[in-house]
């Protein structure tokens, strides 16, 4: 059911964003007949013990991890392929690039007797793996806590931590040069790069604060609620969630160049998980209600079954 739900969510949101929400002043209704049911074009079998199941931006591919290995499936043919790592290295983290059929992978590999963490990209069209850069030497207990990137500026941010106080955020630029990024706060949980600005937005869940880099600044909001970064859309609009319990009850949103006092705010009909909140290409906020099997555009009030 989890896999089916994922397909439905991504597919529905893709259709809503690319078809229903196309920017146009005219609307034309047409009858569409399908020669074959859409379900006939999907043939997916994922092992029951698979983890980290993810889907590519346009739905052509699905991926999952099993142990420290990564597999990819073509959703149309059902072909399952193992993604090979350098020197049989361990996949520590992966995600699909936004608006690209390409995977970003952080892997632990042994080079000349030393364990390293390196960043690579994988192209499913030709099975090509490209080294971006080595991140750091691997130390016991290290985990990749967060990764964010911009396909518009070709910049990556990688946050690495372990249980011994090692916490580092690295910025990798278009030339694959790597820099340390100093962060404020004591409990970074979520971080996203502004697509066209190369500024990192991140939250500190311990102190319920939101920060921006370049320069490193705390964003101030007129609320007593706990705050959490939900995401940033392709138009550089930042979405901050007001937290009630462990769910989002309201959203404050705007651009980094604007005073936060002028940002918009909206209340949700009922608290939602941050993972069920999305944004379309027009910077409208969508909430996926799995129980009621519908998606609501809370910016316009429209609902889509």
Regions found by a protein language model. Name each.
Residues 1-50:
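Sequence/structural signature of beta-propeller modules
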Residues 13-17, 21-22, 69-73, 111-121, ...:
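Structural motif
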Residues 38-45, 79-86, 128-139, 177-183, ...:
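A short beta-strand motif characteristic of beta-propeller blades
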Residues 38-71:
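Beta-strand-rich domains and repeat architectures in extracellular enzymes and scaffolds
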Residues 58-62, 100, 151-153, 196-197, ...:
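Conserved loop/turn motif of beta-propeller repeat scaffolds
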Residues 71, 76-203, 211:
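Non-cytosolic head/periplasmic domains of membrane-anchored proteins
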Residues 191-305:
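Extracytoplasmic/luminal low-complexity segments enriched in Pro/Gly and acidic/polar residues
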């Amino acid at each position: 059911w989890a896999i089916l739900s994922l397909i439905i969510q991504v597919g529905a949101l893709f259709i809503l964003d690319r078809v229903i929400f196309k920017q146009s002043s005219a609307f034309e209704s047409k009858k569409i007949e399908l020669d074959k049911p859409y379900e006939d074009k999907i043939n997916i079998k994922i092992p029951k013990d698979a983890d980290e199941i993810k889907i590519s931006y346009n739905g052509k591919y699905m991926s999952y991890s099993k142990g420290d290995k990564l597999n990819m499936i073509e959703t149309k043919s059902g072909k399952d392929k193992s993604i090979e790592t350098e020197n049989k290295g361990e996949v520590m983290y992966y995600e699909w690039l936004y608006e690209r059929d390409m995977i970003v992978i952080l892997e632990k590999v042994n080079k000349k007797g030393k364990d390293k963490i390196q960043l690579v990209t994988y192209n499913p069209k030709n099975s090509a793996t490209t080294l971006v850069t080595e991140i750091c030497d691997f130390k016991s207990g290290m985990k990749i806590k967060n990764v964010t990137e911009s396909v518009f500026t070709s910049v990556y941010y990688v946050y690495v931590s372990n249980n011994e106080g090692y916490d580092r955020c690295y910025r990798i630029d278009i030339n694959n040069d790597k820099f340390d990024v100093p962060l404020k706060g004591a409990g970074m949980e979520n971080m996203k790069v502004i697509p066209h600005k190369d500024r990192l937005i991140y939250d500190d869940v311990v102190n319920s604060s939101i920060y921006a880099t370049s320069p490193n600044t705390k964003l101030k909001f007129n609320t007593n609620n706990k705050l959490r970064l939900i995401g940033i859309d392709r138009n550089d609009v930042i979405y901050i969630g007001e937290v009630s319990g462990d769910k989002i009850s309201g959203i404050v949103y705007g651009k980094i160049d604007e005073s936060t006092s002028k940002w918009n705010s909206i209340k949700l009909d009922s608290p939602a998980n941050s993972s069920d909140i999305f944004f379309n290409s027009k910077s409208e906020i969508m909430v996926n209600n799995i129980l009621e099997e519908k998606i609501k555009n809370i910016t316009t009030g429209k609902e889509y079954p």
